[in-house]
From Swiss-Prot:
Protein known as: Ribosomal RNA small subunit methyltransferase G
One of the Pfam families matching this protein, by short name: GidB
Binding site for S-adenosyl-L-methionine: G89, L94, V140, E141, R159
GO cellular component: cytosol
Alphabetical UniProt keywords: Cytoplasm, Methyltransferase, rRNA processing, S-adenosyl-L-methionine, Transferase
Source taxonomy: Bacteria, Pseudomonadati, Pseudomonadota, Betaproteobacteria, Burkholderiales
Length: 228
């Protein structure tokens, strides 16, 4: 069966959407970063026809629902200089690749259990020339600092990985002292927060405004006790 092709969209149209979106988020991009993000959208569309990385096939919607959605967390995190970041269940590289592009001083690691998705992520590292990006394949709960990953992380993020309580249970051993777990959610996850495991708590909840997207979005910061 022939894969459905994404509709063609002029790059200038996408660039203007990106310019408008980042202005609304108060994010200043260099020309190089803007081109990297646009190249990423094009490559995501190209590989998606083969690997089905995302259900979204329209480039405009990819820009809004993937790129701008991922960028919406940057204003809340960018004061953390030289951070070590783990993106769990990264899939097509979201939000990790976007973070690596706009925060070149961060060291970003992408994690997924599906080898073909890791292969795509590795290809993006090469094609987008992201020296601050690394990829590790495997279950997050089995990753050990000093073995599969060099060390613990200042920020562990996820955009579409599991229930919040499960996310915390599986990833908490990788949080560095003073670090946090950051979960990107749609509607406010009251039920998931109520099920958080012992030794963890919500530090703050932020409502996100994604440009051009009429949908509810939240960012939840969870801290864990070091003894747990």
């Amino acid at each position: 069966m022939t894969a459905r092709r994404a509709p063609a969209v002029n790059r200038d149209v996408l660039e203007q959407m990106l310019v408008d979106g980042t202005a609304a988020l108060d994010i200043a991009l260099t020309d190089a970063q803007r081109n990297q993000l646009l190249d990423y959208v094009a490559l995501l569309g190209k590989w998606n026809a083969v690997y089905n990385l995302t259900a979204i096939r329209d480039p405009k919607q990819m820009l809004i629902q993937h790129i701008l959605d991922s960028l919406s967390i940057v204003p809340h995190l960018r004061d953390r200089a030289s951070a070590r970041v783990l993106d769990v269940g990264s899939g097509g590289g979201l939000p990790g690749i976007v973070l690596a592009i706009v925060q070149p001083d961060w060291q970003v690691t992408l994690n997924d259990i599906v080898q073909k998705k890791s292969a795509f992520q590795t290809q993006m590292r090469a094609e987008l020339k992201l020296a601050n990006l690394s990829v590790v394949t495997g279950r997050v709960e089995l990753l050990q600092p000093g073995v599969e990953v060099p060390e613990k992380f200042d920020m562990i993020v996820s955009r579409a990985f599991a229930d919040l309580s499960d996310f915390v249970k599986l990833a908490r051993h990788l949080v560095a002292p003073g670090g946090s777990i950051w979960a990107m959610k749609g509607v406010h996850p009251d039920d998931e927060i109520a099920r958080l495991p012992e030794g963890s708590r919500v530090k703050q909840t932020m409502r996100l405004a994604v440009p051009m997207l009429d949908a509810e979005r939240h960012l939840i910061e969870v801290v864990v006790d070091e003894a747990n």
